[in-house]
């Protein structure tokens, strides 16, 4: 943004406009308000003024440095006596200073400093004075509180001492009294003893005893008084020492407060100093300041840095003041701008490696020549608090990106990985779990990032369409049972012959056509009626506006008719009933109406909302009435869609053409589809390379409710997928790949679940026979219908396993897959190429071709029936009654029998019955008639029989003779 006035320039510099106006006036640029124009010359004058006020010199060179380099060689012997040549390089450096310019610059600097004492400086000083006053008031308040606290403590201490002293005195008095009483008692006892011993002496001795007793009492009193006096003196000395300690502490606190007040009340140094002769050596030129315009003018004395610690005796007197602009490093802290506040601010600065002061206060290499060589700044830097970041970790992230998210070097991440026992490079990709562990290890907080859902763009795009809604043609789906005449009816409407060219006379693909009638355009969807094409009918009902339900007048309501009614009701679509084949003699429209009423489709003449139209696809009777009713329903629905908008639609059918690649039949539902648009259909995307109508003629655009066939997709889309036009091919590819990843994850999860389920079933039920199949069909809908129909044939003993199903011809890859999985290849309306046929013959792979879905289902059903285990059935061939029992040595028991029913064969099994209870089941060991072995004995003849491993035969037993036969099972 160009700064043409004062306000804009202040906004660019991020400073108040009032401060900028004051600086402009100080620089000699007369600007009265913020709206005044500001030229480049004015900015240059302001910059020049601020540079000079900050101590910078003008651009003229007043100093020149000459460097001379001299190289020489010397020869010197080493320890071994070998002479070596050493290169010696001598560098000499000399600086010449123009003294007059230095003095003149100093005078000008002093004058400019005097001019710089403007309102901004006064305001700043007033603000500092106010802050100092607040600080002094706060410190004084703290001092008063501290003194009050000390006085309270002193009073409490005195009270405690007085109480302790009184207690001590009382105890001493009691002790002295006790001691005196004891001494008196002892003296009395002694006196009594003496009196008892000297009773016999003369009377003058009694007076001497009284005198001795009085002397003892006086001595005891003197001793007690002396002890009490010593105790009182000790207590007084102790109290005096404590009082002196308290006085010292109070004096120290008062001295500290007084020192703080004196420091804060000390007047600041005058900005304009007395003119002193300049020093012969020019001070070092400070580093060029960036952002000079952001700082107000300050006196030259503020250029000095805070003093550093120096050895004892090396410090200059505190009252000595350096000349202006001399940059004296020995100046007392607080003498320059900010003082100790600046020092604290520096400690809060960014922590860097090495010297960040430009060498001014560092060693002898940096700073002014020959000054303070042994001085070093030992400024303490407070430790910085570690920064804990919230790192969003995606599913995969490289080492470099992860380090960037944590604002550290990639080498730190690599170190942590090495400690964890994993060697990585900077470009190696890590998974989400590992990356989160590393983030936590480095002290940050890891958050699993949400997946970027590209499909959110589609929702935003849908909400942003505000195109004008215009009327569109209705989409009519023709549904009904197989062979009820749906396609023939459409052929008569379109004047075409589609039904005649279909295999088996049945529709196996969903077709889309649009018809121009005198009252408007109608788009028809022709759906198959076979039970296998349930998904096709569901898609037709989903994409339609009106359903035409075709019912044969001679056949009535059939299972697929009921299914079509259910699809229409689920989609909330109005139904128009066409009672077909009324030209047949056995037609009974009234019975059809009654059956449809039972299914919930009530005709208008019965008070319902579904028009019933009797038609004949053969003669064309009633077709005009049918179209009239369809268009009437469309007018009631008021169908509208945006035309000038990106196209949206649905995939009706899709296939893989050998020359064209993936081909999809699309019904445009809204907007206009143009050739060259970028389309997205499920997991497929691409640019529309070619667009054909239902007659195979090229077209450039397709509006709402128009079916077209497009080419140029990346793969065959799924039938029923939504089609949308996107402005960017990159975004379409991103969404398609995202959907492919989701589909792959779901597919793998389903496969894993299926594997586990099948494993558990096999463990519980034993081995199950599998019939592996590879299915290749011409279009997506037929492939889907065939797969679903074959999977329904699975039983508990034989299961259909679809190894692979796809759209297109049979290739070598399919044959190789069949070889590996021992599968049968089924081609529905497709053929194998020459290489695939040769490979199949070489490997013995069975390839079956079908063009009618009935035939494919029936043959697979027959193959599964052959895989079923045969059923074993018992057939009773005869009954034998035991008449007599013979015991034959070395043979065992032989029963003489009469065949009462049927026939007895030598190879038959036998069941022994006694009183109609089975006691043994086994095989015949021998069958004889008159000592001859025979193969069979018929009813009414006698024979001899022996049963293997059974000798407990008695008269009256019965032998039930039977055979076990195997019967083939069917599904």
From Swiss-Prot:
<feature type="binding site">
    <location>
        <begin position="526"/>
        <end position="530"/>
    </location>
    <ligand>
        <name>GTP</name>
    </ligand>
</feature>
<dbReference type="Pfam" id="PF11987">
    <property type="entry name" value="IF-2"/>
</dbReference>
<feature type="region of interest" description="G4">
    <location>
        <begin position="580"/>
        <end position="583"/>
    </location>
</feature>
<keyword id="KW-0342">GTP-binding</keyword>
<dbReference type="InterPro" id="IPR005225">
    <property type="entry name" value="Small_GTP-bd"/>
</dbReference>
<dbReference type="GO" id="GO:0005829">
    <property type="term" value="C:cytosol"/>
</dbReference>
<feature type="region of interest" description="G2">
    <location>
        <begin position="505"/>
        <end position="509"/>
    </location>
</feature>
<feature type="binding site">
    <location>
        <begin position="580"/>
        <end position="583"/>
    </location>
    <ligand>
        <name>GTP</name>
    </ligand>
</feature>
<dbReference type="Pfam" id="PF22042">
    <property type="entry name" value="EF-G_D2"/>
</dbReference>
<keyword id="KW-0963">Cytoplasm</keyword>
<feature type="region of interest" description="G5">
    <location>
        <begin position="616"/>
        <end position="618"/>
    </location>
</feature>
<dbReference type="InterPro" id="IPR053905">
    <property type="entry name" value="EF-G-like_DII"/>
</dbReference>
<dbReference type="Pfam" id="PF08364">
    <property type="entry name" value="IF2_assoc"/>
</dbReference>
<keyword id="KW-0547">Nucleotide-binding</keyword>
<comment type="similarity">
    <text>Belongs to the TRAFAC class translation factor GTPase superfamily. Classic translation factor GTPase family. IF-2 subfamily.</text>
</comment>
<feature type="region of interest" description="Disordered">
    <location>
        <begin position="100"/>
        <end position="381"/>
    </location>
</feature>
<feature type="region of interest" description="G3">
    <location>
        <begin position="526"/>
        <end position="529"/>
    </location>
</feature>
<dbReference type="Pfam" id="PF00009">
    <property type="entry name" value="GTP_EFTU"/>
</dbReference>
<dbReference type="InterPro" id="IPR000795">
    <property type="entry name" value="T_Tr_GTP-bd_dom"/>
</dbReference>
<feature type="region of interest" description="G1">
    <location>
        <begin position="480"/>
        <end position="487"/>
    </location>
</feature>
<dbReference type="InterPro" id="IPR000178">
    <property type="entry name" value="TF_IF2_bacterial-like"/>
</dbReference>
<keyword id="KW-0648">Protein biosynthesis</keyword>
<dbReference type="InterPro" id="IPR015760">
    <property type="entry name" value="TIF_IF2"/>
</dbReference>
<dbReference type="InterPro" id="IPR023115">
    <property type="entry name" value="TIF_IF2_dom3"/>
</dbReference>
<protein>
    <recommendedName>
        <fullName>Translation initiation factor IF-2</fullName>
    </recommendedName>
</protein>
<dbReference type="InterPro" id="IPR006847">
    <property type="entry name" value="IF2_N"/>
</dbReference>
<feature type="compositionally biased region" description="Basic and acidic residues">
    <location>
        <begin position="48"/>
        <end position="63"/>
    </location>
</feature>
<dbReference type="InterPro" id="IPR036925">
    <property type="entry name" value="TIF_IF2_dom3_sf"/>
</dbReference>
<dbReference type="GO" id="GO:0005525">
    <property type="term" value="F:GTP binding"/>
</dbReference>
<feature type="compositionally biased region" description="Low complexity">
    <location>
        <begin position="182"/>
        <end position="202"/>
    </location>
</feature>
<keyword id="KW-0396">Initiation factor</keyword>
<feature type="compositionally biased region" description="Low complexity">
    <location>
        <begin position="105"/>
        <end position="114"/>
    </location>
</feature>
<feature type="domain" description="tr-type G">
    <location>
        <begin position="471"/>
        <end position="640"/>
    </location>
</feature>
<feature type="compositionally biased region" description="Low complexity">
    <location>
        <begin position="304"/>
        <end position="326"/>
    </location>
</feature>
<dbReference type="GO" id="GO:0003924">
    <property type="term" value="F:GTPase activity"/>
</dbReference>
<feature type="compositionally biased region" description="Basic and acidic residues">
    <location>
        <begin position="121"/>
        <end position="181"/>
    </location>
</feature>
<dbReference type="InterPro" id="IPR044145">
    <property type="entry name" value="IF2_II"/>
</dbReference>
<feature type="compositionally biased region" description="Gly residues">
    <location>
        <begin position="356"/>
        <end position="369"/>
    </location>
</feature>
<dbReference type="InterPro" id="IPR009000">
    <property type="entry name" value="Transl_B-barrel_sf"/>
</dbReference>
<feature type="region of interest" description="Disordered">
    <location>
        <begin position="48"/>
        <end position="86"/>
    </location>
</feature>
<feature type="compositionally biased region" description="Basic and acidic residues">
    <location>
        <begin position="210"/>
        <end position="261"/>
    </location>
</feature>
<dbReference type="Pfam" id="PF04760">
    <property type="entry name" value="IF2_N"/>
</dbReference>
């Amino acid at each position: 943004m160009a700064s043409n006035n004062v306000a804009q320039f202040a906004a660019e510099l991020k400073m108040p406009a009032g401060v900028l106006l004051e600086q402009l006036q100080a620089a000699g640029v007369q600007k009265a308000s913020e709206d005044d124009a500001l030229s480049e010359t004015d900015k240059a004058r302001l910059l020049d003024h601020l540079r000079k006020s900050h101590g910078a010199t003008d651009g003229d060179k007043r100093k020149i440095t000459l460097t001379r380099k001299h190289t020489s060689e010397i020869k010197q012997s080493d320890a071994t006596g070998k002479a070596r040549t050493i290169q010696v390089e001598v560098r000499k450096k000399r600086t010449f200073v123009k003294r007059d310019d230095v003095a003149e610059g100093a005078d000008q600097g002093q004058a400019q400093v005097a001019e710089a004492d403007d309102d901004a400086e006064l305001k700043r000083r007033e603000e500092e004075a106010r802050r100092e006053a607040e600080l002094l008031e706060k410190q004084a308040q703290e001092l008063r509180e501290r003194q009050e606290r000390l006085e309270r403590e002193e009073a409490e201490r005195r009270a405690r001492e007085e109480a302790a002293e009184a207690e001590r005195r009382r105890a001493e008095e009691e002790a002295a009294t006790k001691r005196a009483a004891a001494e008196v008692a002892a003296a009395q006892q002694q006196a009594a003893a003496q009196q008892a011993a000297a009773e016999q002496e003369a009377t003058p001795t009694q007076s001497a005893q009284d005198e001795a007793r009085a002397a003892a009492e006086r001595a005891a009193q003197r001793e007690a008084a002396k002890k009490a006096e010593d105790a009182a003196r000790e207590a007084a000395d102790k109290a005096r020492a404590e009082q002196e300690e308290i006085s010292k502490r109070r004096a120290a606190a008062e001295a500290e407060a007084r020192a703080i007040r004196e420091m804060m009340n000390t007047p600041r140094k005058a900005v304009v100093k007395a003119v002193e002769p300049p020093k012969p050596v020019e001070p070092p030129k400070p580093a060029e300041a960036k952002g000079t315009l952001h700082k107000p003018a300050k006196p030259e004395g503020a250029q000095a840095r805070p003093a550093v610690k120096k050895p004892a005796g090396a410090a200059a007197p505190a009252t000595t003041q350096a000349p202006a602009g001399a940059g004296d490093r020995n100046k007392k802290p607080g003498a320059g701008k900010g003082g100790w506040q600046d020092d604290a601010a520096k400690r809060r600065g960014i922590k860097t490696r090495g010297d960040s002061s430009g060498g001014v206060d560092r060693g002898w290499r940096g700073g002014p020549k020959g000054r303070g060589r042994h001085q070093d700044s030992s400024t303490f830097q407070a430790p910085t608090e570690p920064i804990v970041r919230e790192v969003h970790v995606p599913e995969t992230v490289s080492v470099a990106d992860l380090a960037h998210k944590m604002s550290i070097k990639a080498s730190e991440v690599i170190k942590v990985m090495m400690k964890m026992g994993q060697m990585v490079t900077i470009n190696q990709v890590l998974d989400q779990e590992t990356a989160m562990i590393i983030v936590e290890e480095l002290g940050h907080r890891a958050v699993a990032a949400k997946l970027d859902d590209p499909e959110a763009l589609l929702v935003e795009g849908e909400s942003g369409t505000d195109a004008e809604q215009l009327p569109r043609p209705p989409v009519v789906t023709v549904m009904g049972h197989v062979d009820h005449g749906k396609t023939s009816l459409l052929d008569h409407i379109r004047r075409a012959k589609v039904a005649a060219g279909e295999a088996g006379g049945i529709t196996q693909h969903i077709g889309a056509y649009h018809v121009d009638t005198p009252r408007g355009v109608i788009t028809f969807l022709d759906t198959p009626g076979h039970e296998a094409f349930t998904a096709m009918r569901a898609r037709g009902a989903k994409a339609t506006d009106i359903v035409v339900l075709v019912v044969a007048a001679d056949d009535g309501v059939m299972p697929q008719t009921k299914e079509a009614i259910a699809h229409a009701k689920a989609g909330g679509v109005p139904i128009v009933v066409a009672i077909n084949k009324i030209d047949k003699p056995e037609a009974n429209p009234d019975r059809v109406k009654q059956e449809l009423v039972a299914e919930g489709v009530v005709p208008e003449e019965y008070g319902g909302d579904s028009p019933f139209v009797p038609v004949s696809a053969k003669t064309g009777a009633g077709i005009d009435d049918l179209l009239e009713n369809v268009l009437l329903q469309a007018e009631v629905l008021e169908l509208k869609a945006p035309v000038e908008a990106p196209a949206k639609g649905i995939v009706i059918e899709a296939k893989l053409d050998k020359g064209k690649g993936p081909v999809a039949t699309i019904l445009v539902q809204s907007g206009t589809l143009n050739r060259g648009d970028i389309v997205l259909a499920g997991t497929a995307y691409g640019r529309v390379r070619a667009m054909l109508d239902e007659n195979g003629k090229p077209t450039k655009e397709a509006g709402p409710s128009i079916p077209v066939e497009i080419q140029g997709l990346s793969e065959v889309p799924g039938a029923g997928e939504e089609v949308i036009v996107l402005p960017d091919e990159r975004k379409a590819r991103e969404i398609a790949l995202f959907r492919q990843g989701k589909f792959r994850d779901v597919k793998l999860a389903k496969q894993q679940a299926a594997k586990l389920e099948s494993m558990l079933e096999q463990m519980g039920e034993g081995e199950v026979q599998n019939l592996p199949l590879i299915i290749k069909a011409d279009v997506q809908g037929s492939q889907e219908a065939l797969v679903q129909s074959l999977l329904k044939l699975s039983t508990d003993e034989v299961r259909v396993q679809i190894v692979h199903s796809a759209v297109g011809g049979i290739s070598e890859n399919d044959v190789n897959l069949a070889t590996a999985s021992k599968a049968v290849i089924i081609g529905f309306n497709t053929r194998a190429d020459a290489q695939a046929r040769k490979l199949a013959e070489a490997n013995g792979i069975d390839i079956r071709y079908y063009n009618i879905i009935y035939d494919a289902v029936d043959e697979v059903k027959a193959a599964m029936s052959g895989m079923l285990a045969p059923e074993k059935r018992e057939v009773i061939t005869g009954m034998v009654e035991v008449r007599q029992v013979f015991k034959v040595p070395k043979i065992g028991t032989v029963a003489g029998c009469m065949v009462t029913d049927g026939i007895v064969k030598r190879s038959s099994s036998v069941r022994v019955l006694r009183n109609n209870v089975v006691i043994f089941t086994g095989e015949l060991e021998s069958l004889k008639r008159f000592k001859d072995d025979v193969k069979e004995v018929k009813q009414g003849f006698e024979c001899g029989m022996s049963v293997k491993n059974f000798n407990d035969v008695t008269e009256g037993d019965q032998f039930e003779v039977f055979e076990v036969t195997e019967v083939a099972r069917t599904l």
